[in-house]
């Protein structure tokens, strides 16, 4: 077994706060993404306990983007589809959707009420609606998405 001396921390011991800790978990999940155009990781947390993790990519059993599974991502990489266009043709599940589905698969949907969603990217409208529906009460995100509906989050009481 190999022992890791550091994980990107500086020489002085800087213990991450909870938001930093769980965002690091989302960043780690992002590394599993098989999407050609954007890698996103997400973690659902309640009471400082990680409930589920997700990253964007094709569904199980479907060729991933690196293998040519998603034609939309392939066309995007070739410059034939603009960013944000033809998303309905993308085969990749979003990281947030995968984390939400994993909660359902694992039968922990009741434990999600009041949870926090950590994501390396602000969720799209569809993922935002799913998160609100299952009871997510706070989003912590690193990057923004132009179509994010902040009014919807405010109306639903999501921080």
Predicted regions located by residue number:
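Zinc-dependent deaminase catalytic domain
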Residues: 1-159
């Amino acid at each position: 077994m190999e022992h890791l001396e550091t994980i990107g921390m500086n020489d002085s011991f800087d213990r991450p706060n909870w938001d930093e800790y769980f965002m690091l978990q989302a960043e780690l999940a992002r590394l599993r993404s098989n999407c050609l155009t954007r890698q996103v990781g997400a973690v659902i947390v309640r009471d400082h306990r990680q409930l589920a993790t997700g990253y964007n990519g094709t569904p199980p059993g479907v060729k991933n983007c690196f293998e040519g599974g998603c034609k939309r991502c392939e066309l995007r990489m070739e410059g034939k589809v603009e960013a944000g266009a033809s998303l309905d043709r993308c085969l990749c599940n979003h990281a947030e959707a995968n984390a939400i589905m994993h909660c359902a698969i694992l039968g922990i949907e009741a434990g999600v009420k009041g949870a926090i969603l950590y994501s390396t990217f602000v969720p799209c409208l569809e993922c935002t609606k799913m998160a609100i529906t299952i009871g997510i009460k706070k989003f912590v995100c690193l990057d923004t998405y132009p179509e994010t509906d902040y009014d919807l989050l405010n109306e639903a009481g999501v921080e």
